[in-house]
Regions:
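Short beta-strand-to-loop element that shapes/binds the nucleotide-sugar donor at the catalytic cleft/hinge
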Residues: 14-19
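Active-site catalytic loop in hydrolytic enzyme cores
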Residues: 20-90, 104-111, 177-181
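C-terminal beta-strand edge segments of enzyme domains
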Residues: 40, 64, 129-193
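Short, low-complexity, polar/charged sequence segments that are solvent-exposed and flexible
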Residues: 32, 58-61, 92-96, 114-118, ...
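CN hydrolase (nitrilase-like) catalytic-core segments centered on the catalytic cysteine
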Residues: 1-13, 80-163
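Alpha-helix boundary/capping detector
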Residues: 30-31, 122, 143, 191
């Protein structure tokens, strides 16, 4: 990932299963910048329905990465279903969600991407896999959503592809300033698990 980020002069994001020296495994997301700087996030909400909790440990720290003037909150797949994880702090401009959502739940994928964008007044970048597992078919439909819930770009094909859209921090901040929803949000802290 470091080589690809450097060669393409772009940050890359993806997730891998990682086994630590203590034997604990994590579903870890990596945010790799072109200069070789790497930030990580360990998935917080493990997908019990799929047995993920039998193999992985839960991450308990949110990760916000600064890159080219934007602050990106990293979330992984099932985390998207839990709005409190992203809602309780206003410390980011965009959410990046790397996911493994099957075709059978594509409608939910689209709704949740838009909901997280609207309720947090932020961009949401959702990157979903394609391909097949023994019990699931994945059709992608990666998307970039703006702070009003509008789809800027969306993949329609069942193959790996590159999507691009311009995200503009000035217009994001102007929208937040004009329509001050975040000022009225409930203030709370998450208790350690």
């Amino acid at each position: 990932m470091k080589d690809m980020a450097s060669q393409n002069h772009a940050a890359l994001c993806g997730s891998l299963a990682v086994k630590e020296e203590d034997g604990n495994c994590y579903n870890r997301q990596f945010f790799v910048q072109p200069d070789g700087n790497v930030s990580t996030y360990d998935k917080h909400h493990l997908f019990k329905y799929g047995g993920e909790d039998r193999y992985y440990h839960t991450g308990n720290q949110r990760t916000v990465v600064s890159y080219q003037g934007f602050r990106f909150l990293l979330v992984t797949c099932y985390d998207l279903r839990f709005p409190v994880w992203s809602r309780y702090q206003e410390d980011y401009d965009a959410i990046i969600c790397v996911a493994n959502w099957p075709e059978s739940r594509q409608d939910v994928w689209h709704i949740l991407l838009r909901a997280r964008a609207i309720e947090n007044q932020c961009y949401v970048i959702g990157c979903n896999r394609v391909g097949d597992d023994p019990n699931c078919h994945y059709i992608g439909h990666s998307a970039i959503i703006d702070s009003r819930g509008r789809t800027l770009v969306e993949g329609q094909e069942e193959e790996a592809l590159t999507l691009t859209a311009e995200i503009d921090k000035e217009s994001l901040l102007a929208f937040r300033q004009k329509f001050r929803v975040l000022d009225d949000r409930d203030r709370f802290h998450l208790a350690p698990q």
